[in-house]
C-alpha cells in the first residue's frame, strides 16, 4: 500500500510487531512542504494538480448536465489527510449499525468506537466518545469568527437542532466542528502515525519519490 491516509495507520499498527517487515510504496513525495504543514495552505493544495495532488476528475455525471467534477486527492505522505480541510468527523453511528444488521459482524458502532477512541488525542474533555491518549490530535474549532458563529445561529433559526459535538452522542444538527490541527499545524496521518515511529522501527521502510 501507499503512505496515504489509511496506509500510514496500517504501517504503524503492523510494524509494532518487530518480527514483521513493513514497506510502504508511495508514488508521491515526503510531506515537507510548508503548504502542507500550514493549515491556510489548503486552498493552494486542492486548487490544481501538482506534486501533492493527483487532480482527478470524476466521470461525466448524467444528472449534472454531464459535467465532470474536480476531485482533488492527496499524493504523498499522508495522502488526502495532507491536503484536505482538516475537519474531523466520523461516519454516522447509524451507518455502522446498518452494516452490522446487514451481516458485517464486528462493524457496529459499539464495535468501532473503541478504535476511534484509541486513535484520538482529543484536546477537549475526554468522555465515552473521545480518547485523549491517541496519536491523532483533534481539537475543537474556536468560535472566533463572526461568520462561523452566524452560520450556526442561522441553522438553529432554520430549525436544525444544535449539537456541540458531531462525533458525540448526537451527530445530526448544526454546531462547531472538530479539526486535526496540533499547535497551529496540520496533523495528518503521516504526522500522527508514521513520523513518530520511523526512527525507532528498523522494520518499517517508506519508498517514495
Regions from the language model: what does each represent?
Residues 1-209:
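N-terminal redox-cofactor-binding region of secreted/periplasmic oxidoreductases
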Amino acid at each position: 500500500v501507499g503512505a496515504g491516509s489509511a496506509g500510514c495507520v496500517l504501517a504503524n499498527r503492523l510494524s509494532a510487531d518487530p518480527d514483521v517487515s513493513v514497506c510502504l510504496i508511495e508514488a508521491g513525495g515526503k510531506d515537507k512542504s510548508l503548504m502542507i504543514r500550514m493549515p491556510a495552505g489548503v486552498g493552494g493544495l486542492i486548487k490544481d494538480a501538482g506534486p501533492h495532488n493527483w487532480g482527478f476528475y470524476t466521470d461525466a455525471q448524467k444528472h449534472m448536465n454531464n459535467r465532470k467534477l474536480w476531485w482533488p486527492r492527496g499524493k504523498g505522505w499522508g495522502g488526502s489527510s495532507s491536503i484536505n480541510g482538516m475537519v474531523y468527523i466520523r461516519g454516522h453511528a447509524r451507518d455502522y449499525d446498518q452494516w452490522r444488521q446487514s451481516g458485517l459482524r464486528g462493524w457496529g458502532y459499539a464495535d468501532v468506537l473503541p478504535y476511534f477512541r484509541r486513535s484520538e488525542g482529543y484536546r477537549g474533555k475526554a468522555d465515552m466518545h473521545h480518547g485523549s491518549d491517541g496519536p491523532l490530535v483533534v481539537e475543537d474549532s474556536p468560535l472566533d469568527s463572526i461568520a462561523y458563529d452566524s452560520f450556526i445561529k442561522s441553522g438553529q433559526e432554520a430549525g436544525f437542532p444544535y449539537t456541540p459535538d458531531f462525533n458525540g452522542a448526537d451527530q445530526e444538527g448544526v454546531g462547531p466542528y472538530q479539526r486535526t490541527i496540533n499547535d497551529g499545524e496540520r496533523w495528518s496521518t503521516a504526522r500522527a502515525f508514521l513520523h513518530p515511529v520511523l526512527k525507532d522501527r528498523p522494520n518499517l521502510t517508506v519508498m517514495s519519490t
